[in-house]
Amino acid sequence: MADVSRSSSLYTEEDPLQAYSGLSLFPRTLKSLSNPLPPSYQSEDLQQTHTLLQSMPFEIQSEHQEQAKAILEDVDVDVQLNPIPNKRERRPGLDRKRKSFSLHLTTSQPPPVAPSFDPSKYPRSEDFFAAYDKFELANREWQKQTGSSVIDIQENPPSRRPRRPGIPGRKRRPFKESFTDSYFTDVINLEASEKEIPIASEQSLESATAAHVTTVDREVDDSTVDTDKDLNNVLKDLLACSREELEGDGAIKLLEERLQIKSFNIEKFSIPEFQDVRKMNLKASGSNPPNRKSLSDIQNILKGTNRVAVRKNSHSPSPQTIKHFSSPNPPVDQFSFPDIHNLLPGDQQPSEVNVQPIAKDIPNTSPTNVGTVDVASPFNDSVVKRSGEDDSHIHSGIHRSHLSRDGNPDICVMDSISNRSSAMLQKNVDMRTKGKEVDVPMSESGANRNTGDRENDAEINEETDNLERLAECASKEVTRPFTVEEDSIPYQQGASSKSPNRAPEQYNTMGGSLEHAEHNQGLHEEENVNTGSASGLQVENAPEVHKYSHKQTNKRRKRGSSDSNVKKRSKTVHGETGGDKQMKTLPHESRAKKQTKGKSNEREEKKPKKTLTHEGKLFSCRKSLAAAGTKIEGGVRRSTRIKSRPLEYWRGERFLYGRIHESLTTVIGIKYASPGEGKRDSRASKVKSFVSDEYKKLVDFAALH
């Protein structure tokens, strides 16, 4: 403790700045340390600080003192401050005046002399060309500085490019016009000489056309001038005329006189009468439009599609159909038919046509004239056999409804029923055998064998005779078969099932393709069946037909796609002797319809699937653009593109090109350098082939170069 107190006492004695505060330690105040120190103080009052500063000596320059006085006195005095020593000053002008800028050339000083070149100083060619290059550079620079290269262009134009020297010994002839004024004088002299010496027709034609060139031009010019004058005169005359003179035909007569127009009489004109163009009587809407022969081109294009309209020319419709056709209000449901119970005796349904009077008028009803069968009824086509108490009296009627494109029902005679020449029609004969429905294809002979009753045979023969007559009429016109959609059928099916005298109808049509026709002809040669009947019947003869059905079904499986079309588009002809039997077979036939429709739908669904799979195979076989330049190796797709490092062409590395197929040249190999075994610097060139060994010679030949 004694040591600490001793050191502190020493510190207080030896420290000379202990009595000064921080403000008194500036460098200026340190100069005054030689003066005696003021008494020490410990307080920090502001007043003591001021007194301390005032007592201390202050050295100040005279300039600073004057500035301080001026600021304090607030006197406007220009204080001369010393300039900044590092400030850049302008160079003195050496007591010369600055020249004013002017665009005029100074004539006081002579222009600089252009550089010259003396070739005699350079005997050596190397020195000569080096000096000449320097001279050109100096001359260009001098021209840029003086501007003589721009000003003297007009005075000294650049020399023209010399032409290529021609072949020695040849002199170019000056150009001369081949067609001159003397040509016309020669032509006139030739015309005069033609009278004495005849020339060829072609030469005379050319000379005549050349001679009349100028005259025709003059005539055209004269005519245009004359027409302009005439038009101006006509306009002046029209403006000079009064209103009374121009009323009526006055202006027209004036124009006819001045322009020399021939007047014509309208009464003398007669318009020719065209046979194919006829007037339309819009008031007579209740009557049928008159028969009109269509144009030959349209008739060829629409052959077979408008056969109903063509058939109207040969058969006049019944009065019932006329009323139905001319009705301004068509029925709401175009496919519905009135019930047969609501008809009065003697009335006839609009879709029913009696065939017997028509069949009597048809000539030449021989069975050999029957053509190919194409049943083209779009909605309903059936033959209904009605029998009463007297079996001898058979009334057969044909029911058919046809709807035209514009929505009006058009009723006409049934197109065709049977085919006698093919002698075979595939019918859907619904049989009830042991509680099962069987679809049996039957020929006319098979139908006649299976019908046990002779009365039924007589009825069938009598009915088929009537059908043959209708088939002969239908065979005269070329028709096109078409398939009826099943969605448009149920309205008629429901209406026909209500009436007891109508058998249920199946809405299937026969296909008229060439394959089906050839198939029918082959069947006709195999089975020489009885030609006395021409329709298939639905017969309830279970045991006999069941045996026959197995044979026919086996044949049908072998026939392929032709019979499938027949089965889809087959037509059923129902013949029964009593109304009770018809009512009994109604549920059985409805089940058969569902079965046949289901089969046809299955076949129609299978066909587009086959076509789709075939198109899919073709599409899958096509090369994919995404897989271009790749191949599959070991289940992994790898690139077939040629990959190489940057080739060193200065060492002889390069790609080898060649034509290995009928296209452009392709890369067939690569030639690269590889380090040798012994020396490091030496590299041997190697060849790598990208093609098969078949083109090895081609690769080696390309690697030699």
Curated annotation (Swiss-Prot):
Q: Basic and acidic residues: which segments have biased composition?
A: 429-439, 466-479, 515-527, 573-592, 599-615
Q: Where is this motif: Nuclear localization signal 1?
A: 86-93
- Outline the segment boundaries, as ranges, of region: MIF2 homology domain II: 636-658
Motif residue range(s): Nuclear localization signal 2: 159-166
Indicate, by first and last residue, each region the UniProt record lists as having compositional bias (Basic residues): 160-174, 548-559
Primary location class = nucleus
Q: Which GO terms describe its cellular component?
A: chromosome, centromeric region; kinetochore; nucleus
Biological process (GO) annotations held by this record are: cell division; kinetochore assembly
Residue interval(s) of motif Nuclear localization signal 3: 556-563
The record's keywords, sorted A to Z, are: Cell cycle, Cell division, Centromere, Chromosome, Kinetochore, Mitosis, Nucleus
Q: Where is this motif: Nuclear localization signal 4?
A: 592-599
UniProt GO molecular function? centromeric DNA binding
Composition-biased stretches, type Polar residues, lie in 315-327, 490-511, 529-538
Tell me the compartments it is located in.
Chromosome, Centromere; Chromosome, Centromere, Kinetochore; Nucleus
Alphabetized InterPro entries for the sequence: CENP-C/Mif2/cnp3
The record's family statement is: Belongs to the CENP-C/MIF2 family.
In its UniProt entry, what is this protein called?
Centromere protein C
